[in-house]
Amino acid sequence: MKPMYRSRSWRRKYVRTPGGRTVIHFERRKPKVAHCAMCGRPLNGVPRGRPSELRKLPKTAKRPERPYPNLCPSCMRKVIKAQVRASLS
């Protein structure tokens, strides 16, 4: 095993070859799930992937197509309500 692969930042994937041997493939770990900027809840509709994988996706697949895509839907509603109330008063 190369010294660079001894670190646990590389995920070890055990692969069975056609010849019957089990070999280890090293791959980078997936990043953590995206979280809401206000409450910290995990965001739906945002894929977990390395930048090289996300680069291949269209922009619409990377984040929700609605106002404030960095907030969860409930926090987004709170922000929009606060803005409307502020503009009315």
Curated annotation (Swiss-Prot):
The keyword Cell wall biogenesis/degradation does not apply. It comes from the Archaea. Belongs to the eukaryotic ribosomal protein eL34 family. Keywords: Ribonucleoprotein, Ribosomal protein. One of its GO terms (molecular function) is structural constituent of ribosome. One of its GO terms (cellular component) is ribonucleoprotein complex. Residues 41-69 are annotated as: Disordered. Residues 50-66 have a biased composition (Basic and acidic residues). It comes from Thermococcus gammatolerans (strain DSM 15229 / JCM 11827 / EJ3). GO terms for biological process: translation. NCBIfam families: PRK04059.1. This is Large ribosomal subunit protein eL34. HAMAP family: Ribosomal_eL34 (MF_00349). InterPro entries: Ribosomal_eL34 (IPR008195), Ribosomal_eL34_C_sf (IPR038562), Ribosomal_eL34_CS (IPR018065), Ribosomal_L34e_arc-type (IPR047868). The keyword Ribosomal protein applies.
